[in-house]
C-alpha cells in the first residue's frame, strides 16, 4: 500500500506531525510512505523516516524576480508530474490552511482516496476559495475531517492529526500514539543549556534584556555549563547583540551555536540539560525530544499549537493577569524572577538525562464559572 502524505508547512508544524507519521509508518509500513515537505525540511524528514520516500516541495515564501505564485507554479511542475505519474492507494494532507497551489498539488496525486482536514481558510468566507474547495471535494470525493474546536488534552493541530489518522486507519487512535517524537541520528553533545529566544513573529518575542535578567538569576545553576544561544542562520546578528548584553551583565559562559542543518539541531537539542525558549519551533523540538524545557508562552494561538508536553519535563509559562488587566500582558505577565524560579524548579525536580514521568493524557473536568 503506497500512501502520499502532503505536509507543506513550516518547521515546527512538521515536528507536530511526527507522531501521526510514526503511527502511519507502524501500521502501513514506513517504506510505503511518500512524504512531501518543503525544501528546508527534506534532510530532517529523511533522517526521521529513512525508509520512506521524501519528495521536495520547492516553494518560496518571498518573491525575487517573478510573481511569487507564478514562480512557485513553475518550480512545482516537476513535482506535479511525479505525483500524477505515481499510483497511490491514498493521499493524506496534514495542512489545515491550504492555499490554491497546495490544493492543486494535493489533488493532482494519482489516487481515488483523499483524506484531509477542513481547510480553515474557508472561514474567511471568500467565494472563490469556497467554490474551489467545494468543487474539489465533490469531484474527488474527499474524506474531510472537521477541524476540532479544541481538545481537553491536546492542541487542536495535534488533535486534528489524531482524528485524520483515525479515519485513514479506520480505528480509534489514542492521544499517546499521536504525540510528536524526534529521534537522534548522530553524535549527541551533552552538558549544555540552550537558549532560543528569536522568532520571526514579533508578537511572540520576549525582550532580550529580560532574557538577560533570567540568565543572570540562573548563574548559580549554570556553573560548569555552556549556554548555547541558537536559532536560524539569519538570526546571527540579533544573537550577537544578545551575547554582548549577557557578557556585559557578567554571564561569561554563553556562546552562539548555529547548527548547519536541522538534523544537527536535533542532536544538539537532544543533549541539553535545559532548554529556554519561546513559542517557536525550538519549543516543539525540545518537547518532542522530551528535554527539560521552559517555554515563555505569549498565549498567541493558545490551544492550537500549544501548550503540549511529553512528560513533566516540559513547562509552558503563561502570562499572569496584573491588577486591573482584563487579559494577560505579554511579556509583562512573565517577569524574569518568575521565569527563573520556574527554571530552577524544573532543574531541581528533573534528573539530567534521566527517566521522565510520562504525562497522563486525560480529559480535564469542566471549569466552574
What residue ranges belong to the model's regions?
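Catalytic machinery of carbohydrate-active enzymes
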Residues: 1-369
Amino acid at each position: 500500500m503506497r500512501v502520499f502524505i502532503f505536509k507543506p508547512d513550516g518547521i515546527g508544524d512538521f515536528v507536530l506531525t511526527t507522531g501521526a507519521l510514526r503511527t502511519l509508518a507502524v501500521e502501513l509500513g514506513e517504506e510505503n510512505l511518500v512524504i512531501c515537505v518543503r525544501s528546508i525540511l527534506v534532510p530532517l524528514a529523511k533522517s526521521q523516516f529513512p525508509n520512506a520516500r521524501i519528495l521536495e516541495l520547492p516553494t518560496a515564501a518571498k518573491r525575487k524576480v517573478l510573481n511569487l505564485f507564478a514562480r512557485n507554479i513553475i518550480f512545482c511542475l516537476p513535482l506535479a508530474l511525479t505525483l500524477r505519474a505515481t499510483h497511490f492507494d491514498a493521499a493524506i494532507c496534514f495542512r489545515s490552511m491550504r492555499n490554491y497551489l497546495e490544493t492543486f498539488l494535493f489533488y493532482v496525486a494519482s489516487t481515488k482516496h483523499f483524506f484531509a482536514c477542513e481547510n480553515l481558510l474557508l472561514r474567511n468566507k471568500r467565494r472563490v476559495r469556497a467554490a474551489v474547495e467545494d468543487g474539489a471535494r465533490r469531484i474527488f470525493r474527499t474524506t474531510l475531517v472537521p477541524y476540532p474546536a479544541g481538545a481537553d488534552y491536546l492542541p487542536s493541530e495535534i488533535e486534528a492529526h489524531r482524528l485524520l489518522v483515525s479515519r485513514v486507519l479506520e480505528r480509534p487512535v489514542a492521544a499517546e500514539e499521536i504525540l510528536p517524537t524526534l529521534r537522534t541520528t548522530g553524535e549527541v553533545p551533552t552538558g549544555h543549556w540552550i537558549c532560543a529566544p528569536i522568532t520571526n513573529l514579533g508578537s511572540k518575542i520576549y525582550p532580550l534584556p529580560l532574557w538577560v535578567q533570567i540568565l543572570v538569576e540562573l548563574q548559580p545553576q549554570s556553573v560548569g555549563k555552556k549556554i548555547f544561544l541558537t536559532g536560524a542562520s539569519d538570526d546571527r546578528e540579533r544573537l550577537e547583540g544578545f551575547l554582548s548584553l549577557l557578557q556585559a551583565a557578567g554571564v561569561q559562559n554563553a556562546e552562539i551555536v548555529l547548527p548547519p542543518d536541522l538534523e544537527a539541531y536535533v542532536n544538539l537539542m537532544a543533549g541539553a540539560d535545559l532548554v529556554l525558549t519561546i513559542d517557536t519551533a525550538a519549543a516543539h523540538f525540545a518537547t518532542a525530544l522530551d528535554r527539560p524545557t521552559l517555554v515563555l508562552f505569549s498565549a498567541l494561538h493558545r490551544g492550537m499549537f500549544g501548550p503540549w508536553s511529553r512528560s513533566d519535563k516540559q513547562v509552558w509559562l503563561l502570562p499572569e493577569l496584573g491588577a486591573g488587566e482584563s487579559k494577560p500582558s505579554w511579556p509583562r505577565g512573565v517577569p524574569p524572577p518568575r521565569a527563573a524560579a520556574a527554571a530552577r524548579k524544573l532543574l531541581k525536580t528533573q534528573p539530567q538525562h534521566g527517566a521522565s514521568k510520562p504525562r497522563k493524557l486525560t480529559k480535564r473536568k469542566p471549569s466552574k464559572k
